[in-house]
A protein has these predicted regions:
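Cytosolic signal-transmission helices at domain junctions
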Residues: 211-220
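Short helix-perturbing small/polar motifs within transmembrane alpha-helices
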Residues: 1-58, 64-165, 169-208
Length: 220
């Protein structure tokens, strides 16, 4: 990596360490059972990853748990769940010799994204669904910008070119994810979080749809 890329990498990791340390020092959980169930689901989500054509990196469904966390969990719980899922995504069935570097950056980036999305969404007395929309928008933009930034510096490419590829692929599936997450949360609010098992078939269906779409892309 270039010196600029190393500085960028270091700044992201340092900021994430500060955010995570502050969150863990204020750890709280309202329902430990719910936390561990969502953590297990997030672990599974990290294994459902695909490599997108023309893009360095992989995509998984861990953002579903960021949105669930903003709606139902505390900030520290959401950070741990999202970080765990991203760690699994980064190393699961990866033969890349630089996977541990990717792991460090990816977990750092998602930590920043989650905290920013959580803070912005919870800072205003918004209706439930609008809060979810705000969180998803902040997370989407922050995530794609941070990842595109390191790829631009490491690969000496145009930022807009890299970001637009991420944007095109992610946008449709973020939309689907936000919609399905909203439905799950509405059901959970009426019946209790035990219906979180509904997440599993939805996650797998979205994963299969993404795999199918990628196979339809010429050259993949």
């Amino acid at each position: 990596m270039s010196r600029t890329a190393v500085v960028y990498f270091g700044c992201v990791v340092a900021l994430a360490c500060f955010v995570l340390a502050r969150a863990i020092s204020h750890w709280e959980t309202e329902d430990p059972a719910r936390f561990f169930v969502y953590l297990a689901f997030a672990f599974l989500a990290g294994t459902l990853k695909v490599r997108l054509p023309g893009i360095t990196g992989t995509f998984s469904l861990n953002f579903l748990f960021v949105l669930i966390g903003v709606a139902n969990l505390t900030s520290p719980e959401t950070l741990v769940i999202a970080g765990t899922s991203m760690a699994v995504q980064s190393v699961w069935r990866s033969s890349n010799p630089a996977r541990w570097i990717h792991l460090l950056f990816n977990v750092s980036a998602i930590t920043i994204c989650v905290q920013l999305a959580f803070t912005v969404a919870r800072s205003f007395p918004l209706p439930f669904l609008l809060q979810l929309a705000v969180a998803s928008g902040v997370y989407f933009l922050t995530n794609t910008i941070l990842v595109s930034g390191i790829l631009t510096l490491a690969e000496d490419k145009s930022f807009l070119a890299v970001w637009s590829r991420w944007f095109r692929w992610f946008l449709a599936y973020y939309g689907i994810g936000v919609t399905t997450t909203a439905l799950i949360l509405i059901v959970n609010r009426q019946t209790g979080w035990g219906y979180a098992l509904l997440i599993l078939p939805i996650m797998y269906l979205e994963y299969m749809c993404l795999c199918y779409d990628i196979k339809e892309v010429p050259g993949t």
